[in-house]
Each structure stands twice: as structure tokens, then as C-alpha cells.
Swiss-Prot record:
It is found in: Cytoplasm. This is Desmethylxanthohumol 6'-O-methyltransferase. GO terms for molecular function: O-methyltransferase activity; protein dimerization activity. InterPro entries: COMT-like (IPR016461), O_MeTrfase_dom (IPR001077), Plant_O-MeTrfase_dimerisation (IPR012967), SAM-dependent_MTases_sf (IPR029063), WH-like_DNA-bd_sf (IPR036388), WH_DNA-bd_sf (IPR036390). Keywords: Cytoplasm, Methyltransferase, S-adenosyl-L-methionine, Transferase. Its EC number is 2.1.1.338. It holds the Pfam family Methyltransf_2.
Length: 352
């Protein structure tokens, strides 16, 4: 029996990409949104009608295959199914706790992140995994001819998909930060610069809760070029390896894991220079803190990121000890790590 379980696991891993593709299909067909729009579980024919309506097509969906997609995703607990027995047995499909995170109009929707991670341009990078193990070559560059930042700058469509994905997790991450880190944020006076802040969603959300804070959103020129005007937010473009706008505190989310230790130290030292409040100033870092022995919620996802990040950016995820060593090398001796109910943790690095 143990041998059969081992065989079963290999089959499951072999076809695990189908999970992602079925999820992507459900998002592209807007199945969760169609069910949600009815306010109750609906039939397969109603889902098909919604798909046809959304696509403005005269061609009817492939209902037999749609039923297979739904059967598969019900088994994966993405949707629910129960049967009504009137004159004939009819299956009714509803939303689960998982599919609610796929609603396009839901503030905390993960749909854009799924679409980015399953995009052919993203998936292409994974085909160079063996190559990376053998010679540490830049896998994104192997797949696309340049690094991810250059590629995003030169390809507006991918840049939009990438920025939408990053923006989609802002409400999730900032919601957890704002509810679990009130003391750490409430003591900040003056200006906060969000380094690598994307299109400015995080700093804007922070300023809604703490109106006394002045916000700067700092990112690469091609990112800032697409950033919307946000009340009170100053958008500044530049290079984190050159200099960072002056502020009383620095916020960085998912930036340092993109780079080597050497490059991170350079960025962190630039952050130190940028902080004007030398007595109370600090850097607030939102990053994954790996614990390979842990089996808590999100730990599996953290381990996936540990494989993903080196391939896409040449960076890496870090353990608590590795974070402390890195920050010590950059000149920070007072460090505090706080676990919150999302994938990354809060790492505070104080000037004194």
C-alpha cells in the first residue's frame, strides 16, 4: 500500500499543472463572477449562458467539457455542488471560501495574481529550472532575452499584467499590516517612502488610516509612468541602487527578495541615508521569513516562493537568521520580526 501511495503522489505531482490551468480557465471564463451575480448556486446551463453573454459570442460554450471543468474544481474545493431532485436531478454550483478570492470586483481578489503566474511568459521561465541548478544562469533572461525589469519596461502588455498582479495583493497585505501592526505604524510622524511601491496602492492605503503621514511612492520609471494620481501621494521615479528619497521612515514590500545579499546591503545602506529621523527612524520590511521545519498556514506557499524568486529575479527568500545577518551587515543592530496572518512577515530595522 505504501508503494501505491508513493506512485499516486508521483501521478499527482506530474499533473499538478492542471490545477493551475483549470483555475486560470475559471478566471478567464469568469465562472465565480457569474455565480456571484445570481446571489445563489446555479445550474451548469446558467453558467454557460453567463459565459456566452460575457463574451458577446453567438457560439455556445462546450457544455460537456465545462461540466468536466466544474467537476474537477468541485473536487478541488474551488466550487461547491449540491443536487436538487425535482423532475430530474440537477446539479447546482456555488462559491466556496476559495472561489470568493477569484471574484474580479472583490477588493482582495487574487485573480490578477493567478493570471500573471499562469501566463505563458511566466510559465516559460520554469522550463529552465534544470539549467539553473546546473549553472546558475539567469532563467528569465534565458527565456526572454533580458531580465524581468527590462522585459517589463519594453513590453507594456506584460507590464500591465505584472502591475495588476502586484496591485491585487496590496489590500490583502496592507489589511493584515494595518490590523496587526497598529503600534508600529501609529508612532511614525512625518514622511514615509514606499520603496518599490508599484503604482502607489500601499502608501495610499496607509495614508487613509494615518492621515498625519505624508506619502512618497518610489519605483522604476516605467512603473511610475503607469501610476494613477492618488490623493496626497507623491510619485517619484528612480533607481534604488543610486539613492532613495528622504523620509522619516522607509517601507519596502517584496523588494529585497529580488536581489542578492550584496545588492540588498547596498539598498539598505541607501535606506539608512534616506532616513532623516536618526533617533526614531526605521525601515519596515514586508518579506517572507522562511522556516523549512514549520507546517503552519502559508508555509507551503513560502516554500514555492523559495523556488520562484531565484528563477525570476536572481534573488532569494531568507530565514530569520539570514535576515538578521543581512541587516547587521548593512549597519542595523536592532531588529524585530513580527509574524502576521499573510505570507510575509514584518521585519523592523531601527537606526539606533
Amino acid at each position: 500500500m505504501e508503494s501505491l501511495r508513493g506512485q499516486e503522489q508521483i501521478w499527482q505531482l506530474m499533473f499538478s499543472f492542471v490545477d493551475s490551468m483549470a483555475l486560470k480557465c475559471a478566471i478567464e471564463l469568469r465562472i465565480a463572477d457569474i455565480i456571484h451575480s445570481h446571489g445563489k448556486p446555479i445550474t451548469l446551463s446558467q453558467i454557460a449562458s453567463g459565459i456566452r453573454s460575457n463574451s458577446n459570442s453567438s457560439i455556445s460554450p462546450n457544455i460537456p467539457y465545462l461540466s468536466r471543468i466544474m467537476r474537477f474544481l468541485v473536487r478541488k474545493n474551488i466550487f461547491t455542488e449540491h443536487q436538487e431532485d425535482n423532475d430530474e436531478v440537477i446539479s447546482l454550483y456555488g462559491l466556496s471560501d476559495s472561489s470568493r478570492w477569484l471574484l474580479r470586483d472583490f477588493k482582495s481578489s487574487l485573480a490578477p495574481m493567478v493570471l500573471m503566474q499562469t501566463h505563458p511568459l511566466s510559465m516559460a521561465v520554469w522550463h529552465f529550472l534544470e539549467d539553473y541548478v546546473r549553472n546558475s544562469s539567469n532563467t528569465f533572461e534565458k527565456a526572454h532575452g533580458c531580465n524581468i525589469w527590462e522585459f517589463s519596461s519594453a513590453n507594456p502588455d506584460f507590464n500591465k499584467i505584472f502591475n495588476n498582479a502586484m496591485a491585487s495583493i496590496v489590500p490583502i497585505y496592507m489589511g493584515a499590516v494595518l490590523s496587526s501592526y497598529k503600534d508600529g505604524l501609529g508612532c511614525i510622524k512625518g514622511t514615509v517612502v514606499d520603496v518599490g511601491g508599484g503604482t502607489g496602492g500601499s502608501i495610499s492605503e496607509l495614508m487613509k488610516y494615518y492621515p498625519n503621514i505624508k506619502g512618497i511612492n518610489f519605483d522604476l520609471p516605467h512603473v511610475i509612468a503607469t501610476a494613477p494620481a492618488l490623493d496626497g501621494v507623491t510619485h517619484i521615479s528612480g533607481d534604488i541602487f543610486e539613492s532613495i528619497p528622504s523620509a522619516d521612515a522607509v517601507l519596502m514590500k517584496g523588494v529585497l527578495h529580488c536581489f542578492s545579499d550584496e545588492k540588498c546591503v547596498k539598498v539598505l545602506r541607501n535606506c539608512r541615508k534616506a532616513i532623516t529621523d536618526k533617533k526614531n527612524g526605521k525601515i519596515i520590511i514586508l518579506e517572507i521569513v522562511l522556516d523549512p521545519t514549520s507546517n503552519q498556514i502559508f508555509d507551503e506557499t513560502r516554500m514555492v516562493y523559495d523556488l520562484l524568486i531565484p528563477l525570476f529575479s536572481g534573488g532569494k527568500e531568507r530565514t530569520e537568521l539570514e535576515w538578521k545577518r543581512l541587516l547587521n551587515e548593512a549597519g542595523f543592530t536592532s531588529i524585530k520580526i513580527t509574524k502576521i496572518p499573510i505570507i510575509p512577515a514584518i521585519i523592523e530595522a531601527f537606526l539606533v
